[in-house]
Structures are given as structure tokens and as C-alpha cells.
Amino acid sequence: MTKNNEGFTHRNFAAVLQKYKYDLNLGDIVAGTIFSFELNGVLVDIGTPISAYLPIQEVSSNQDLNNFTSLNINDTREFFLLDYNIQSKQLILSIRRLEYIRAWKRIRQLLAEDSLLNVMIKGFNKGGMIINLEGISGFVPNSHLGNFQKSEQFNNKFIKLKLLNVEEKSNNLILSHRRALISQASSNLIVGNIIEGIINQITPYGLFIKVGNLKGLVHISEINIKNLEQISSQFKIGDTIKAVIIHVDKKQGRLSLSMKHLR
């Protein structure tokens, strides 16, 4: 019933509809009323002489939805005009495609507004966190989790995030917890302020400092040492240090610190 018809074009579709003197095109959004349930789909009245059919797999993009539980006889709503089945002579409708289009529209708006989002965690993998935003699967890389510890106990819990990269054509949705944390604490993150934090990572290029829920970097060039070998002997993980805020990168959620500028 839902199999695409090879070789069937928009011109063929237009010819079929012209026969019935009805002005529709593939990709149109149409209003319709559900009037019958079938084994693998529902029949919908969209005001055309040609019957319209909504396959079960086109009901929703939400994988948690169970078949037709969200639909009822006499429900009137909008559908996406997906295809025309030559064999059954039915217009094929989709709610899933309509949800997808509208979800990306909302995501583009959220990106433009740089909104702080409360998003459900769906799981974790080696590279980071998997989330769901407006029905679209998204990803938070490890580098943008900040001090958040990955654990399955957080599945289906909510986390504050900000959008980092949105590419609708490639269905690529990247978010950042680090950006959200910087945004929430921005009123206290003033360049020149002295902060106190705990060293939680020592690298050849500097010290990573835990400042509340935030992670800041004291680059090696901003530490009062004469050579690189001194960094491991002078500092230990767990040490509490003071540093000066020298840069707040809200776009990438980065906090740059300096020990050279301490008075």
C-alpha cells in the first residue's frame, strides 16, 4: 500500500488530479477527517473524489507512539500529501513528514533566539549524549558536556542545553550543555573577576578547573611557571586555586582563566 511507484512523477500526479479537477500537488499540506481504520493504516476524507490513505508508518516520528493510539474516528487535522499509489488509486498521506517539517522550523527559530532548552536525555554512547528535541534526534559531544557525568541513571531525565550546530539537510543537530551552563552563570562571569576552583585535569597545555558546574581552562601561557615540566610538580588534581577570568566565550561555552593576572 505504501510502496513508492517507480517512474511516477509530479507530472503524472498532476494529470491524475486534473482528471478530477482538483488542485493539489505532492508536498502540499491538506486538511482531512479520519473516517475508517484498516489493518495497516487509516482512510482520510480530504474532500477529493480520490480516497486518501495514512499508512501506519507515517503516523508519527515519535517512536514511543504505539500505532494509532493518537488517532480517532472523526479526528480532523492536517496531513502532508506524500505520494499517489497507482495500484490502489489512493493519495498517500503522512503526519510524520509534517511533524518533521514543523520540528525543523521550530528548531531554526530556537537557534535564532539562542534559547535555553530543557531537553530529555535518551541515552549515551562513547562520543557523548543522545537527546531528542522536537522529535528530532540530537547529539551532545563529550567536549560539550562540561562536568556532567555520563550515566544510564540519567536516561529520560532532563538537562539544560543550547543549540550549537543545526544542519537540516544532513539531519545534523548538535547541542551543548557547556553553552547552557555559561549562559545561566553569565551574570557572574565578568572578565577581571577572581574565581576559586578545583583542579580536575592536568594536561601539557594547561589546567582544567572546576568552578561550580563550569569547567575553565588556565592555559600554560597563563601560569606563572618557567618551564612545562613544573606544571606536574607544582599542581595536583584536587588542589584549590584562584584565577582571573580573562575571556568568556558564550558561543562555544568556554571559560578562559589566568593565574598571571592575579594581584
From Swiss-Prot:
User: What parts of the sequence cross the membrane?
Assistant: none
UniProt-recorded name of the protein: Small ribosomal subunit protein bS1c
Which is one Gene Ontology cellular component term of this protein? ribosome
Keyword Ribonucleoprotein present in the record's keywords: the answer is: yes
- Identify the Gene3D superfamilies for this entry: Nucleic acid-binding proteins (2.40.50.140)
A single Pfam family it belongs to is S1
Q: Which UniProt keywords apply?
A: Chloroplast, Plastid, Repeat, Ribonucleoprotein, Ribosomal protein
* Organism name: Pyropia yezoensis
Q: Which family does it belong to?
A: Belongs to the bacterial ribosomal protein bS1 family.
Query: Known PANTHER family for this protein?
Result: 30S RIBOSOMAL PROTEIN S1 (PTHR10724), SMALL RIBOSOMAL SUBUNIT PROTEIN BS1C (PTHR10724:SF7)
